[in-house]
């Protein structure tokens, strides 16, 4: 072997260098360079503890308390906003309804109980022994019907009207004449007559110039009491025939006539009745005639709306 830096003598064969069998590490995809001291984390996804990829992006898992903290104010704001919208909508609906239907006033006419209903039904059938017909007041406001039997209510007229329609359907069914159209005609005719009565009385009060505290709802209540006698007459007619129908209906007609006279005279003739002055003037005469006409119309309508139901 020759020293370094000296050329090999001529004729000496040159040795062939074979490639070294030492392995050179080759980097595989997904593996770090073996000659690199530190891992390149600029493009690789961050890893949390244990080598698992972290969805948070900073090596820490997202905290559930942070998400709840952010979601709570949003939900509270949504609830407050929704409740405010509901309150505004309710207020708007109440105002629009009160323009046409006095809901607050209607609550007064349905303030009844079982004792009142029983006493009022007895008064409608037997009004002859009742003495005190004046409505009681408390601080210039009439007391609720459940505390005063003389106060008008809408519960009995409404229930009586519905019951009358059901009894009419029963009567038509026993005679093999029932049909939905005929029952609807019965209900619509009863409502039409009631509406006509109210309009006629209000127009008459306007023409006679009567200053009274009788309201439209009071009129509907008083005029609706006649359905109680109509129910009794039709049921008796179904059980005992026409004789029973005429007897019971006649009694109920007289009773409702007396009831209406004694009730309306305190409404239409309130000033004259309070002062005890005899009704002699022309205007008071008209008021008395109006009271008599309203009371007399009740028996006529009671017969007209029920006579065809009993055969």
UniProtKB/Swiss-Prot annotation:
| Cysteine pairings via disulfide bonds | none
Chain residue ranges for the region called Disordered: 1-57
User: Matching InterPro entries, A to Z?
Assistant: Yif1_fam (IPR005578)
Residue numbers on the Cytoplasmic membrane side: 1-153, 211-216, 260-289
Q: Which residues lie on this side of the membrane: Extracellular?
A: 175-189, 238, 311
**One Pfam annotation, family name?**
YIF1
Residues spanning the membrane: 154-174, 190-210, 217-237, 239-259, 290-310
Identify the tissues in which this protein is expressed: Highly expressed in brain. Expressed in Purkinje cells of the cerebellum.
What family, per the record? Answer: Belongs to the YIF1 family.
Q: What is this protein called?
A: Protein YIF1B
Q: Which gene encodes it?
A: Yif1b
């Amino acid at each position: 072997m020759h020293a370094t830096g000296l050329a090999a003598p001529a004729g000496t064969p040159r040795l062939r260098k074979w490639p070294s069998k030492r392995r050179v590490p080759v980097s595989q995809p997904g593996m770090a360079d073996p000659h690199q001291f530190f891992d390149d984390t600029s493009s690789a996804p961050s890893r949390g503890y244990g080598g698992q990829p972290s969805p948070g992006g900073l090596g820490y898992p997202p905290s559930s308390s942070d998400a709840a903290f952010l979601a709570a104010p949003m939900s509270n704001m949504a609830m407050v906003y929704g409740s405010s919208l509901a309150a505004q909508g309710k207020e708007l609906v109440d105002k629009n309804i009160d323009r046409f239907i006095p809901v607050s006033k209607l609550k007064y006419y349905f303030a009844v109980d079982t004792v009142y209903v029983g006493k009022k039904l007895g008064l409608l059938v037997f009004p002859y022994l009742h003495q005190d017909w004046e409505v009681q007041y408390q601080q210039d406001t009439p007391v609720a019907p459940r505390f005063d039997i003389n106060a008008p209510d809408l519960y009995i007229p409404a229930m009586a009207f519905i019951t009358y329609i059901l009894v009419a359907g029963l009567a038509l069914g026993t005679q093999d004449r029932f049909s939905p159209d005929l029952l609807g005609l019965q209900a619509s005719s009863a409502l039409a007559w009631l509406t006509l009565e109210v309009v006629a009385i209000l127009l008459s009060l306007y023409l006679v110039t009567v200053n009274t505290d009788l309201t439209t709802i009071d009129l509907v209540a008083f005029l609706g009491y006649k359905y109680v006698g109509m129910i009794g007459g039709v049921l008796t007619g179904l059980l005992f025939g026409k004789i029973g129908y005429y007897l019971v209906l006649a009694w109920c007609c007289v009773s409702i006539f007396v009831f209406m006279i004694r009730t309306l005279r305190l409404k239409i003739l309130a000033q004259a009745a309070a002062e005890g002055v005899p009704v002699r003037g022309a205007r008071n005469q008209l008021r008395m005639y109006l009271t008599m006409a309203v009371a007399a119309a009740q028996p006529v309508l009671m017969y007209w709306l029920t006579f065809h139901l009993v055969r």
